[in-house]
Curated annotation (Swiss-Prot):
Name of the protein: Outer-membrane lipoprotein LolB
Gene3D superfamilies named in the record: Lipoprotein localisation LolA/LolB/LppX
Membrane topology recorded in Swiss-Prot or TrEMBL: Lipid-anchor
Source superkingdom: Bacteria
Lipid-conjugated positions (S-diacylglycerol cysteine): 29
Annotated gene: lolB
């Protein structure tokens, strides 16, 4: 994987990472997602919390946490991200060929693909497409996993894909309720923890 230039400051990178890492997670509102038009069997939704810690090579840490809710009908998706006080920080809307991130201040970023949107905002690749699979307890298509471990039901519990070490646990009928993702980049280590609080 090619290295990308780092953003100007760890905090800026962390803030952008917070907004973009969860592009794969989908929501219609800050609380429980509302039904999408034409919703059917492919509808997938989750509500939860996230915590992201970036540790620099000199030991300095930047951390951010908040809430998320998402709704995915298999084609289009909606996402809201909130800060710990419950205020909306960003909304993401996506469909085939388009992903748009709108921040609380009205700033908009758009790209044809959510991975490209994340990389534009971060200056570093993020497996947005992979997260959509991992949150459902599936492996990302097109990228062979390393160190794959499964539970007694055959569900993935540990693996490495696209530069991320992932641990999935506390499965319910929709997927893991706890995801711990780690990535080592030049000069920094990224730790992401997602906890599902509502199906």
């Amino acid at each position: 994987m090619s290295a990308c230039p780092a953003p100007r400051s760890p905090f800026r990178w962390l803030h952008a990472f917070t907004l973009c890492l969860l592009l794969a997670v989908l929501a219609g509102c800050v609380s429980v997602p509302k039904p999408m038009a034409g919703a059917g069997e492919d509808v997938f939704s989750r509500v939860g919390r996230f915590a992201i810690t970036v540790t620099e090579s000199d030991g300095k840490q930047q951390a951010v946490q908040g809430g998320f809710a998402w709704r995915d009908d298999g084609g289009s998706y909606l996402l809201d991200l909130t800060n710990p006080l419950g205020s909306t920080e960003a909304r993401v809307e996506g469909r085939p060929g388009m992903a748009v991130l709108t921040r609380a201040n009205g700033e908009r970023l758009a790209a044809e693909h959510p991975d490209a949107l994340a990389e534009d905002a971060l200056g570093s690749p993020v497996p947005v497409t992979g997260l959509r699979d991992w949150l459902r307890g599936r492996l990302m298509a097109g990228a062979a996993p390393d160190g794959l471990e499964r539970d007694a039901q055959g569900r993935p519990t540990a693996f490495e894909q696209d530069g991320w070490n992932a641990r999935l646990s506390r499965y319910d009928a929709q997927g893991p309720q706890l995801l711990v993702l780690q990535r080592q980049e030049p000069g920094r280590r990224i730790l992401v923890r997602l906890v599902i609080t509502q199906p």
